[in-house]
Amino acid sequence: MRALFQCSLLRPWLALVVILPVILLGIRFAAAEDIVVPLRTQAQLIVKLAEYDRNLVPRPGPRVVLIVRGKTTASSRTAEGIASELRSYDNIAGVAHIEKVIDFVSAGDLKKRVQWESAQIVYLCPDFEAQIPSIADELTGLTVLSVGAAPSHPGLGSVVGFDIHSGRTQLLVNLKQAQRQNVQLHSEFLKIVKVIR
């Protein structure tokens, strides 16, 4: 009876020992894509950054910003939030603009949408960590600025991302991918960002 009692007391702890690492693993993966810079600040930096991209030339009609969302609620909220923040600006690099929120299907499909819409800026919401390298491959050769919402995104292949360092917002630039996507940033601007090569 005593052994049975001890066993029943141990069961909840055993379950916790088994379940807790799984929960923590899930938290770790979720944290990898956490947005640390507020969307309002991100929008402000995107607008400012566009002024320093020498290849972001005016095209007929408004400048198209594709906002790519995943299947999660957090991704959809991010998409609507950044679209709203960007719409508060009259122009991006002197040109009127339109934001289009689209669902991610595949890297190849995104390339087709960029070409079809003549998009010059692509914003990647959370949920794209695994797909960013293939997205980077597909966007290579196009003239498009890809912006990742999370700090990990530039290291995986977006041209730009955002982070917090010593309490300050930091703009991350993947210089190699910038060259692949014909993003030509002024050298003076590169002095104030963290360059990822």
Please place each PLM-identified region on the residue numbering.
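Short hydrophobic alpha-helices and adjacent helix-cap/hinge residues
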Residues: R2-C7, R11-L16, L25-R197
